[in-house]
């Protein structure tokens, strides 16, 4: 059950000129049939146009907040404040609310690794032998060329074509693309592990693109 301050919800209703629905987050997901909640559309002049909803649900508000918190300009503007207190999210504006809801929903789907587009192959394996992470994965164990990273797992096998943007991407205080591998030093990776890692890399790349789109909307 969403734990919202209803006084704030009433202010948001006024800001958007919309009523707040009574679906829980789970009901929102169930009624949408998936992770990402689709917005209503109508064909006008041969093209699909997003239509405004008559009310917003808890998940819509969650996705709006999630989008704002992933805005690079928002993070830069409030970075000192965010170090000492909870984030302050601006009240939504009618002209941008649903765009941010859509982008936030896409981010949520990516970060839950449920987006089907994440299966697109990005990384490759170079060399022959078992995928034993023998090296400590320090700077000497990887090289960068044409914005792509080659990571040497051991003397025989490397992971190649890791996009630099994903390799250097931070979430919180760590870099997922690097931490995931470092946490597995000494282990032999299998096909399922590499498929999962490819999905992580894909999610990080797509997150970077969506964050830029969020800034364009804000």
Roles of regions detected by a PLM:
Residues 1-218:
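Sequence-level detector for compositionally biased, low-complexity segments
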